[in-house]
Amino acid sequence: MKFAIVIEKDEDGYYVVKVPSLPGCHTQAKSLDELMERVKEAIELYLEVKKNVEDGEFIGVQVVEVKTG
């Protein structure tokens, strides 16, 4: 399987990756090589856990207002 990933570099110099099609699947590393290894592992673990967990019952979508400033 192939997955699109989004890579960013944070203010501490770490590379951070997320997998948009797998909510909550993300990792970080100091180098791009290490990041690619870690994201593959994160995806594998995500898929392994997902197949062993039943999907919850969809309840709905709500809008929440938060005041800032």
Curated annotation (Swiss-Prot):
Gene3D superfamilies: 3.30.160.250. InterPro entries: HicB-like, TA_system_antitoxin, TTHA1013/TTHA0281-like. It holds the Pfam family HicB_lk_antitox. It comes from the Archaea. Coiled coil: none annotated. Belongs to the UPF0150 family. This is UPF0150 protein AF_1072. It comes from Archaeoglobus fulgidus (strain ATCC 49558 / DSM 4304 / JCM 9628 / NBRC 100126 / VC-16).
